[in-house]
Amino acid sequence: MPSVKIKENEPFDVALRRFKRACEKAGILADVRARECYEKPTTVRKREAAAAVKRHAKKVQRESKKFTRLY
């Protein structure tokens, strides 16, 4: 669990923002959303495979764009 020590004369909003950033870095909210309801192992594998395919297509498109000559 992330913790934030409030500095002297530090506004509450700033401390809250630092806490939110620490929680996001730790991945707490993503973990809570993932565990919110049960997901079958086959569904997990299918979703992760689809994400890998999407990442690969994005990478290939970025690499092919590098070599396009515009002259």
Curated annotation (Swiss-Prot):
One of its GO terms (biological process) is translation. Pfam families: Ribosomal_S21. Keywords: Ribonucleoprotein, Ribosomal protein. GO terms for cellular component: ribonucleoprotein complex; ribosome. One of its GO terms (molecular function) is structural constituent of ribosome. It comes from the Bacteria. Belongs to the bacterial ribosomal protein bS21 family. PANTHER family: MITOCHONDRIAL 28S RIBOSOMAL PROTEIN S21 (PTHR21109), SMALL RIBOSOMAL SUBUNIT PROTEIN BS21 (PTHR21109:SF22). This is Small ribosomal subunit protein bS21. The lineage of its organism: Bacteria, Pseudomonadati, Pseudomonadota, Gammaproteobacteria, Cellvibrionales.
